[in-house]
């Protein structure tokens, strides 16, 4: 329990279940990662289609090296997956609860409708 200097009538048992500061670090990393609008845009596109770097760079109006840099960060965070087909590498949003939650949050916050809905 955390002794509070002022008693405002809150249920103290709730504080007993409060996560430790380090428990929020992983969550904070996702928010930091998505603090870049280019990464949010790339992630959103990949939630709806599978693409190569060349096509993605045209779609998001960025250079291929810049898109590759952002993809590497998204992939390292587990938000994007890739597969190789011959010489081409295709990227898509990861099929994970976190990726789906972030996709839904982006669309809800921006009132964006998914293609095909």
Kindly label every feature range from the protein language model.
Residues 75-85, 92:
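Beta-hairpin "wing" of winged helix-turn-helix
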């Amino acid at each position: 329990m955390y002794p509070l200097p002022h008693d405002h009538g809150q249920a103290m048992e709730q504080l007993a279940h409060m996560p430790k500061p380090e428990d929020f670090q992983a969550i904070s990393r996702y928010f930091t990662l998505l603090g870049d609008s280019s990464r949010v845009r790339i992630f959103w596109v990949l939630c709806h289609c599978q693409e190569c770097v060349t096509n993605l760079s045209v779609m998001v109006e960025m250079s291929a090296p810049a898109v590759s840099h952002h993809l590497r960060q998204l992939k390292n965070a587990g938000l994007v997956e890739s597969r190789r087909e011959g010489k081409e590498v295709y990227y898509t949003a990861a099929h994970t609860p976190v990726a789906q939650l972030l996709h839904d949050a982006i669309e809800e916050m921006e009132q964006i409708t998914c293609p095909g809905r």
